[in-house]
């Protein structure tokens, strides 16, 4: 995806006319230097665009209004270079509906001990200008992030880049369309929910299309297009004997390719970037979409099984956040456990649909095997193990009066034994702080059995996401203790209840 090329982040300097034109000229020069350097050296995902100084209430309000109506503007970074009386910002911040970050920095890294005078002090007032801005944000209950550090500091730059990813993701989510092919898996609770509340809170829309509508598009795909895609399969994957030319399951591979092309065409024509399927509603499809879903996820689409639109949307959101980062992000499900004293493990997988972006560095196997669920022909799928290292599992649930985001930090490990009879992609991990604590906390908090699994993102990314969307965050990591965790759930119930 090249989604970051579609957006920019505005860089606004707060000041005032009290200090005279020469001071404002220097402020402008400093701002130009900082923005140019950050764009050139900081490896930011988005371009920073310097806007005119904000020195009066009208100027600031004009900038904020323009930001709202500029589709390319993903958010605004504010630097209080000098003292900028915060009452000047009230009208602008009242109408601003784009993400906001205060960069609490200054032009110089060190103090000029021998030459510092009051002119220098008046020009470089971030230390208390930023506090004035922070007060009005707190007074207005304005959600905003703060990053402190010198503009040349790599950690400060990294944090700004991380926030930019959140800002772009939020803008993308406002336009996100999720299509459900068929309805929710029958009688399942956690995959259901309030789609209207979700659209109000996050911006994405969720609607259902009959599987027959998809089948019609699938059937329109030409044999030539199918053949070209299968050639791509041949070069990208290790095909088993059954899946190769003259193999007894070769037709299943061709059918899977036709389904992939049809699904992608349907998604593109409808402007959808996330989707769900359900094995209970496959009328007209020759097989449960497995390979198609895996490859579409790798291209940046959100997906979840059994009609789980919340997880599908969350996967798309996290795919956008993690664009260009190392690792991968996938639909996942806690499937089964390995209980061993001191070495409890979780084997994660799904019937078919795990994204190859999390695979180890080798070509996945493309195979066709029996699937008892769904009642269709044997589906094609990619089989692989997952990279090792730190990861997260995230789940978005609907509690009726609010949305809760659960995040469990995990450590992905190598599979200690081969799995010769398991014909699906999988991941093996240790849950933090341990499996009993993590699973009990997850269950008590209502976490779903479907998750988004990511090597690319971490807890800080999801914390920013929750803050930006003003939703509850529940964390399970090495610091989690069940009594305190349960207390936090009770406190959250009171806090969010008071906000209704």
Curated annotation (Swiss-Prot):
EC number from the UniProt entry: 5.3.1.4
Q: What class of enzyme is it?
A: isomerase
| Family in the record | Belongs to the arabinose isomerase family.
Q: Briefly, what is this protein's role?
A: Catalyzes the conversion of L-arabinose to L-ribulose.
InterPro entries assigned: Ara_Isoase_C (IPR024664), AraA_central (IPR055390), AraA_N (IPR055389), AraA_N_sf (IPR038583), Fuc/Ara_isomerase_C (IPR004216), Fucose_isomerase_N/cen_sf (IPR009015), Lara_isomerase (IPR003762)
**Pathway it belongs to?**
Carbohydrate degradation; L-arabinose degradation via L-ribulose; D-xylulose 5-phosphate from L-arabinose (bacterial route): step 1/3
* Complex formation: Homohexamer.
The GO biological-process annotations, alphabetized, read as:
L-arabinose catabolic process to xylulose 5-phosphate
Which cofactors must be present for this protein to function?
Answer: Mn(2+)
UniProt keyword annotations, A-Z: Arabinose catabolism, Carbohydrate metabolism, Isomerase, Manganese, Metal-binding
Supply the name of the protein. L-arabinose isomerase
Could you tell me the superkingdom of the organism this chain comes from?
Bacteria
The gene it comes from is: araA
* SUPFAM superfamilies according to UniProt: FucI/AraA C-terminal domain-like, FucI/AraA N-terminal and middle domains
- Give residues annotated as binding Mn(2+): 306, 333, 350, 450
CDD domains in UniProt: L-arabinose_isomerase
Question: How the cofactor binds, per note?
Answer: Binds 1 Mn(2+) ion per subunit.
An MF annotation (GO) of this entry: manganese ion binding
Q: Which organism is it from?
A: Enterobacter sp. (strain 638)
Task: Supply one GO CC term from the record.
Answer: cytosol
Q: Give the catalytic activity.
A: beta-L-arabinopyranose = L-ribulose
Q: NCBIfam families under this entry? A: PRK02929.1
């Amino acid at each position: 995806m090249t989604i970051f090329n579609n957006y920019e982040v505005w860089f606004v300097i707060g000041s005032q006319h009290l200090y005279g034109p020469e001071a404002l000229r220097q402020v402008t020069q400093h701002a130009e230097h900082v923005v140019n350097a950050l764009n050139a050296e900081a490896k930011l995902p988005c371009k920073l665009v310097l806007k005119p100084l904000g020195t009066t209430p009208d100027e600031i309000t004009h900038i904020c209004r323009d930001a709202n109506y500029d589709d390319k503007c993903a958010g605004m970074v504010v630097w209080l270079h000098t003292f900028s009386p915060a009452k000047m910002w009230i009208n602008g911040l009242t109408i601003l509906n784009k993400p906001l970050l205060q960069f609490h920095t200054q032009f110089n890294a060190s103090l000029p001990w021998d030459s510092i005078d009051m002119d220098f002090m008046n020009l470089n007032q971030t230390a208390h200008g930023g506090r004035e801005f922070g007060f009005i944000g707190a007074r207005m209950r304005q959600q905003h992030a703060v990053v402190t550090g010198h503009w040349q500091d790599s950690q400060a730059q990294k944090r700004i880049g991380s926030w930019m990813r959140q800002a772009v993701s939020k803008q993308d989510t406002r336009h996100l369309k999720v299509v459900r092919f068929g309805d929710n898996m029958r009688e399942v609770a956690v995959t259901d929910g309030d789609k209207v509340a979700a659209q109000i809170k996050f911006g994405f829309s969720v609607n259902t299309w009959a599987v027959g509508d998809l089948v019609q598009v699938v059937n329109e795909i030409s044999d030539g297009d199918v053949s070209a895609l299968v050639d791509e399969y041949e070069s990208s994957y290790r095909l088993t004997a059954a899946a190769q030319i003259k193999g007894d399951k070769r037709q299943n591979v061709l059918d899977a390719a036709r389904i992939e092309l049809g699904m992608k065409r349907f998604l593109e024509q409808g402007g959808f970037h996330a989707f769900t399927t359900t094995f209970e509603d496959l009328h007209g499809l020759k097989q449960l979409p497995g390979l198609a879903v895996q490859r579409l996820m790798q291209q940046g689409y959100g997906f979840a099984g059994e009609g789980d639109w919340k997880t599908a949307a969350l996967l798309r959101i996290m795919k956008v956040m993690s664009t260009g980062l190392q690792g991968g992000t996938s639909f996942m499900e806690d499937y089964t456990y390995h209980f061993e004293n001191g070495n409890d493990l979780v084997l994660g997988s799904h019937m078919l649909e795990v994204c190859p972006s999390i695979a180890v560095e080798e070509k996945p196997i493309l195979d066709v095997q029996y699937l008892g669920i769904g009642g269709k022909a044997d589906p094609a799928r990619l089989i692989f193990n997952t990279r090792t290292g730190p990861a997260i599992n995230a789940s978005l649930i609907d509690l009726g009066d609010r949305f809760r985001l659960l995040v469990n930090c995990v450590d992905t490990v190598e599979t200690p034994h081969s799995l010769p009879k398991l014909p699906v992609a999988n991941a093996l991990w240790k849950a933090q702080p341990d499996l009993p604590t993590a699973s009990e906390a997850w269950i008590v908090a209502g976490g779903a059995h479907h998750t988004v699994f990511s090597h690319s993102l971490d807890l800080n990314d999801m914390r920013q996401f929750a803050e930006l969307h003003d939703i509850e965050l529940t964390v399970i990591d090495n610091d989690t203790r069940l009594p305190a965790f349960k207390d936090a759930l009770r406190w959250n119930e009171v806090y969010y209840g008071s906000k209704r």
